[in-house]
A protein has these predicted regions:
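Short, hinge-like loop/turn segments at secondary-structure boundaries
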Residues: 43-44, 139, 168-172
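Conserved acidic functional residues
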Residues: 30, 123, 154
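Residue-level detector of anion-binding/catalytic polar loops
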Residues: 23-24, 119, 149
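Catalytic cores of alpha/beta
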Residues: 67-73, 129-147
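Flexible glycine/acidic-rich beta-alpha junction loops that bind and position SAM and/or redox cofactors
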Residues: 36-37, 93-98, 126-134, 146-182
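Mobile, glycine- and charge-enriched loop segments
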Residues: 1, 108-132
Length: 182
């Protein structure tokens, strides 16, 4: 079950960062924009209280961004936010197997950066189930065609308690028992 932090508390915390000219604040929950009203309230607050310095990094599900959210994002000053989009893979079998939901066709249609004010980086992960050399190459080309400012390649981390941790023996995964769990 998803929990959402009280908006008034979030605004107080954000104001602290803004008042202290913190260079960057990261929201590292990929479900940030799963609740439209919550995301919009935070983004509107940031626009209204922008200090011209602080950059906010959001992990978002691009296939969930709607036109109202995209329109609001396009009003932000250049450099105010950056979006990280965890594609992981464009192989539907892989996405299904790792219990993710993502509509890559919808991600491809989402045109946040047409406003030229948002830095976007898209992530891929090497080593996922059903992802071989050719499949990963296709995922890379699919994401590269979207022309993000940054394409980040990560290696599979098998975190304790995760689906991949439990399924590691089935896939023959060998990983470190200590950080970074690669």
């Amino acid at each position: 079950k998803l929990r959402f932090r009280d908006l008034e508390l979030v605004k107080e915390e954000l104001q602290f960062f803004l008042d202290h000219n913190v260079p960057q604040v990261k929201f590292v929950d990929r479900t940030f924009n799963c609740k439209h009203d919550h995301a919009m309230a935070i983004w509107k607050y940031l626009i209204a209280h922008d200090n011209g310095i602080t950059n906010f990094h959001f992990e978002v599900a691009a296939d969930l961004l709607n036109e109202e959210e995209i329109a609001l994002i396009r009003t932000m000053r250049p450099g105010m936010i950056q979006l990280e989009i965890g594609v992981q893979s464009t192989n539907p079998d892989t996405i299904r197997e790792i219990h993710r939901k993502m509509d890559f066709a919808q991600v491809s249609e989402t045109r946040v950066q047409e406003g030229h004010n948002v830095h976007q980086h898209l992530d891929l992960i090497a080593g996922l189930p059903y992802e071989d050399y050719d499949s990963f190459g296709k995922s890379f080309c699919d994401v590269y065609r979207l022309r993000p400012q940054q394409l980040q390649l990560g290696f599979l981390k098998v975190l304790k308690g995760s689906f991949m941790y439990q399924a590691a023996p089935e896939y023959g995964c060998v990983c470190q028992s200590r950080e970074p769990y690669e």
